[in-house]
């Protein structure tokens, strides 16, 4: 009887086992196994979360009502040296995807090769730059050769995990926001073909099957590179006019499903500016609207985590390196706990959970602990961390085969009887010494390129210590060499003549950024014990080490506000960058990387601390600035006298969202661009501009790489709405004036050199109604 029952069940069992699952594109909807499916995705990044906490973070996303995880695959963390791949431990992306499936989640994979993500060089490996003439994100033969190898390795890890193979992966992205980089359908097509070749396989019927391929971009540029056979998705932020964002897509593809592939829950922080936040109500309202209309989304970020070690990137134009924390003001905070944003969103998500009960919010894997103040008592000078020395011309990090760290550049000088001006393109933070005496710094963040040196005698030694920060991750400037880039010159006037000196004989010394180098330096150097009152030793660049003891482990936030600038290692783990200017003053230290008993802390401080003390807090400090001077651009001496000038154009902007172009009656020539606003469409006095471009006489946009803000009559810096936001390549950020500051409002841009301009392009805020949009204006070029 039992045997007969088993035989009866066998055909059904075999049929079920053979039935292939699928994710396809239907009319106005995605189809999961043939049924309409709305993607509710949580963006999370496996390298930004300790592996021991992966399961907890995935469960947190599920408890928020998400059904999918969206993740980038970071090329440069998997291939840190050319040809050497690592998919183990915290880099085991396949294990992360399997864990997602175990928790009942689907997965969207975004394998680049470029990913942005406020990550070093946008995920591209630094060693690509050893080929100085490489064309990144183009059909450069070497670039594409390495891309194909990388994508093949990724597919070896993940292609067996597609939904057609019984795994969780339903979609794979082709490149990433390419419309913000350029227009090159041939390149994007080749990336698509590479992914198809690795992810698509023939089924039993001989049909090629694989995950749905899609490309994401902004509503303002997605048509530049849109391929006919790919799904098109939009990226935009909270508060955006959602109907407007999908309007053009609906016109071009009226039957296509709609998806916001990056709905920005917050924003990233940069060194020297305040911590970014975004209102919960705008995020919740946007998701509610999308779900009510059947629009799929991925919430970027749902949990941001931490850019440990040297992995934080930088934005451009205007070099703006990102802090270590990637909290992002996301619903799940940096250390994995639910925020008020989380619970507000959870209430809304419950409405769209098919009547099912929401999963419980999981308990944190570890509690939060504090650590009493302790002192780092060992010290060796920074040069004990040297790796290689080469004599000759100036060399970049890449030419010295070093990805991350610092370099010391040294030479001897001829006699210069008067003060001189040192000029160099330093990437990124340079400190200048003569005969061991500190002279000053050149900081790329402040767009500094020169420094005045005192008179020197023949044979004086010039040392320049250059720390490289994260490589630019967005825009054309991602080809970001580190060190002294190009020539260094000294100019001086004496004996009624101007002299230019270009030292040619340099000693290039590399100081890599890694734990092994730090340990070697402390072992081989003549370690000095820093007594409590010997703070004369704590003002020097070097390696510092100390210890703290624990009876119980837990997550904590180590405070480094007394320190200068550099990197921190705890028990061998690279925790990230510190910089006294803030806003981040603490580093998140996961309890899974701590231990009972003695714990080691090493700080590589390239500046030197004010005091060698550290303590552990139970809350982070992400919004404490310690600046030498304000970030505002309101020096009255920089304000131009517009009364004596004739405007290049004047008139009235249209109301509403979207780009507008103002053509000049005749070309205007000048180095400075001023836009004066005398009224707004919404009747308020709070003006805002999201982005500005200028066009040359050929009608094409001119580069903004050299732009800086000269003057702004008013800037709302509490929300980081400073003048530099109008050329930061981000349509969701904006310059905004302070309420009550009064008309006229004025913003002046230094273009970097004299330009001939025929038109100005203006973008108001992306939110519905375009709050703060300018009505009456005058444009000056001088």
Residue spans for each PLM region:
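Active-site neighborhood of glycoside hydrolase catalytic domains
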Residues: 143-227
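Short beta-strand-plus-loop segments that form exposed binding edges in beta-rich domains
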Residues: 464-470, 603-609, 676-683
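Aromatic-lined ligand-binding clefts that engage carbohydrates, nucleic acids, or primary amines
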Residues: 419-433, 462, 548-571, 578-579, ...
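Catalytic-core region of carbohydrate-active enzymes that cleave or remodel glycosidic bonds
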Residues: 198, 239-333, 337
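Aromatic-lined substrate-binding rim segments of carbohydrate-active enzymes
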Residues: 54-120, 192-196
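Aromatic- and acidic-residue-enriched segments that line the glycan-binding/catalytic groove
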Residues: 83-91, 102, 113-138, 188-193, ...
